[in-house]
C-alpha cells in the first residue's frame, strides 16, 4: 500500500475513534454539577473586588478586518487602581496585581455560548475556588470567587478550565496574568517590569483565528501555530531604554514548548520561576519553558549601542516526538512574530488522495519571539542582587512514602492519552489518588509514551505536567532512559530549584517531586498542560482527605 494511502487511512480511523469520544467528554452529564451560584459572603471583606466577564469580542490585530476573539472584560469594584491593568489592543484579559495575604473577590460572569470557569494557575486556594471543571457555569450565570492570596510573590495566571473546551477558550483569547507583588526596592519596577505572554496562533486570509484545522492531528499532537503573538497583540518589537529590565515570561501556548535564548549570545539571567524568586540569580545559555510555566528574566541594556536590535529567540531542539504511522511533522524555517513575518515555507501538503493539508511548524523549530530595540534614552540602572530570600527545602526524612513514591504514568493507549491507564472522569477519585491532609509525599511521574499494542509503542511526546492547588519541589529528574539526542538538545535549560507547579516531562523521563497537602481538603486535579491532551482526558482528580 502506498505510504500516502496508509497515512490517510490511519488518520481517518483515528478521527472516527477520537471525535465521538471527544464530543462525549465535552457534553456528557457525568459531572453532576454542584450548586455553584454563590452569593457574596458578607463577612468576607475583600481588599480587592473585581468583575471579570468572559465575552465574545473583536480586536484590531492586523490591517483589514478585525479578529473575532474571546476576552475577559474587567471592572475594578474595590481596591487600588494598580490592582487592574488593561493591555491595549490585546485580546488577553487584564493583569491582576495583588499582595500576599490580601482578600480577593472575583465576580465571574459568563457571556460565552459555552460553559466556562476560571482556574487560578499556581494559586493555593480551597478546592471550591480552584476552578475545577465540575464548577462550570452557563451563559448568563455568575460564579463568585473569594479567597486569600496565600502564595509567595510571583507570576501566576488565570485561564478557563471547562473540560473539553479549555484548549479552544484559551486559544480564542481567555487568559491573563495574576501577579503577586513583592515589596523589594532592588528590582526593576514600573516601565522596567515587563510581562511577556508568549502564544502561537494561526490566522486565515481574513485575519480570523484558525483552531484545529487539521482536526485529528491537532488534537493528538496538540495545537501548533505558525505565528507568534506576544501579550495578545500584533506588535513584534518594543523599544527599551538603556537600563535594567525584569521580564515576567509566561508560556501561554496550547502545546508549544520554547527553548528561550538571547540573539546576541548573552546568558539568560533567571531570577524567578513558577513560585516566584529563586534563592539567587542563575545564568543559563537558554531555558526550556513548557506550556503553563513561568520564568523571570533580568536584562541590562545600559551598555548596548543605540538602535541595536536584540531578539528573544527560541532555539532548535529535539522534542522526542514520535507519531508512528501518523508520521512526523514537516520541518519549516524561522517563524517571526507578526503577520508580515509569518511562516509560509515548509508547510507539508498531502497529495490529492488525502485532501488534507498540514499548516504547522514543529515543536523544536527555530523561532524569533520578540525584538527589543535599544533607544538613545538613558534608563534606570539597578545592580543585580547576588541573592534573594532563601527557600526552605522539604525535609525528606518526614515524607510519608519516602521509600515508595506514588507513580503516575503518562502514556498513549487505546487511541487515548491516559494517566495510569485511566482517562478523566468528573467526580471519580481512585484509591491511589487519595492523600492525607498535613502530610508530605513523593510523587514520581513517568512518561512511558505507550501502553499496549504496536501503535501505542510508536507514540511518544513530551508532556507539561501541572498539579492544582499547591506548589512543589522537584527532587530528581531521571534521564537515564531519555534519548541522548533529546536530552543533549535541552539539558542546560532546566532550573529545578524553588517552588514550581508545572514541569516538562520528556519521553522516557522520570521526575520525582515533593508535595505537602495542607490547609484544604477536597478534590483537585492534575493533568497534562498540552491543552488538547487535557481536553482529550489526560487529566485526573486527586483528593485531600482528613
PLM region descriptions:
Residues 18-19, 521:
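Residue-level signal for mature regions of secreted extracellular proteins and peptides
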Residues 21-24:
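C-terminal motif of bacterial Sec signal peptides marking the signal peptidase cleavage site
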Residues 29, 61-67, 73-79, 122, ...:
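Active-site pocket scaffolds in enzymes
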